[in-house]
Structures are given as structure tokens and as C-alpha cells.
Design a protein with these regions (language model features):
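N-terminal cap/lid segment of alpha/beta-hydrolase-fold proteins
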Residues: 39-61
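Structural signature of beta-strand start/N-cap positions in the alpha/beta core
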Residues: 75, 101, 141-143, 170-171
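Conserved alpha/beta-hydrolase "nucleophile elbow" surrounding the catalytic nucleophile
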Residues: 80-82, 146-151
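Flexible "cap/lid" loop of the alpha/beta hydrolase fold
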Residues: 155, 159-198
Length: 198
């Protein structure tokens, strides 16, 4: 015999989860549109200038550069975490003002960058970071800073282009990141639910 109370609760929970996903997707699309239309004031308003870097697969990446640095200063490139944007680094940008050239970028599918094809991988983000370096810091010393997914992006770049590390990339800072295997973590949830969380 089927327990109708339990079934009703399960359907209610599924309905709430579905509604939450739909609301989140719509809110993300609206926020991205507003960001692209310039409604938000963020890091660019603090003196940086924007450039677009187009990747080898045609995705346009939004990059902000703060050039207030002495000649020969390193370029510090910040890579944000999952579901964040280049606006994640205001304190760091301020602390480095006048000491280093600061580059902030929105990883694909985040902030004002284009989304690209479905199924984007961390390896792809590493290739994107290589394009950013080539476009906005083709010469000189580079320091890479990555938070969460941004740290994984840096590690993917190191795997993809190890020759950059040492001659060009002089230092790396990895903040609250992982060396991989994130998709295998179930967060203590049943497998189908854990897959939704990723």
C-alpha cells in the first residue's frame, strides 16, 4: 500500500526544488543582461578599463585592467570562484593600486562574459586564462591569483601550458580551492541530488 502522505510530501518537495531552480535561472539571466547593459557599477567604475578577449572557440571574455603601476611592475591576474565575477576582488585591487598592474576577468558563463557551449570544463577555463594572458599581458612577469574555481582554472592552465610557469608566471596564490575531483563529492546527499548540486 502506498503512503499518500509521504508521496504528497515528496511531490511538494520536488515542486519547491523545481520552482527554486527556475527562479534562480531567470534571476541569473536578468542579472547578466543588466550587467551587460551597464546597470551595475562595480570594479570598472573604480578606474579600470574594459577589453574583450575572444577565445579560440569564439567566446568573448570580459576583462578589466587597472594600469596604475610603475614600469616593470608585474601583472597580477585574478580568477574568481564559481558563481562569482570579477567584482569579487575590490580589496585586493585597492591594496595593489600603484604597485602592480591588476587584471580581473569574468570566466566564461560568469559576469559579463559569454556563456559558450554547454559542458564547459575546468580544462577549458585553463585554456581561456591562457588567452587572457596572451591578450593583456603578452610580456613581463605575471602573478596568478585564484579563488575556488579560479584556483582550479590556474591549475588547469599549468597542466595545459607548463612552459608559462617560471619564465612568465613568477608566482601563484590559490585560495580555498581544490586540485579536482569535485564532481565525485556527494555532500552527504543521495547521488541524484548530489549531481544537481554540481
Amino acid at each position: 500500500m502506498v503512503d499518500m502522505g509521504r508521496t504528497a510530501k515528496g511531490l511538494t518537495a520536488l515542486g519547491i526544488l523545481t520552482a527554486g531552480v527556475v527562479v534562480g535561472a531567470v534571476a541569473e539571466r536578468l542579472a547578466t543582461r543588466r550587467l551587460r547593459e551597464g546597470e551595475f557599477v562595480g570594479i570598472e567604475a573604480a578606474g579600470g578599463h574594459s577589453v574583450e578577449v575572444v577565445t579560440d572557440d569564439g567566446v568573448s571574455l570580459h576583462v578589466v585592467i587597472h594600469d596604475e603601476a610603475p614600469p616593470g611592475a608585474p601583472t597580477v591576474i585574478f580568477s574568481h570562484g564559481y558563481a562569482l565575477s570579477l567584482d569579487s576582488w575590490p580589496g585586493q585591487r585597492e591594496s595593489l593600486r600603484g604597485l602592480a598592474r591588476v587584471v580581473l576577468w569574468d570566466q566564461r558563463g560568469h559576469g559579463a562574459s559569454q556563456r559558450g557551449t554547454p559542458g564547459t570544463t575546468i580544462d577549458r577555463l585553463g585554456v581561456d586564462l591562457g588567452h587572457v594572458i596572451d591578450a593583456v599581458a603578452p610580456t613581463g612577469d605575471v602573478v596568478l591569483v585564484g579563488h575556488s574555481m579560479g584556483g582550479m582554472t590556474i591549475m588547469a592552465l599549468a597542466d595545459h601550458a607548463p612552459n608559462l610557469f617560471g619564465p612568465r608566471v613568477k608566482a601563484v596564490a590559490l585560495l580555498a580551492t581544490s586540485a579536482g575531483g569535485i564532481a565525485d563529492i556527494d555532500l552527504g546527499l543521495p547521488r541524484p541530488v548530489a549531481r544537481l548540486a554540481h
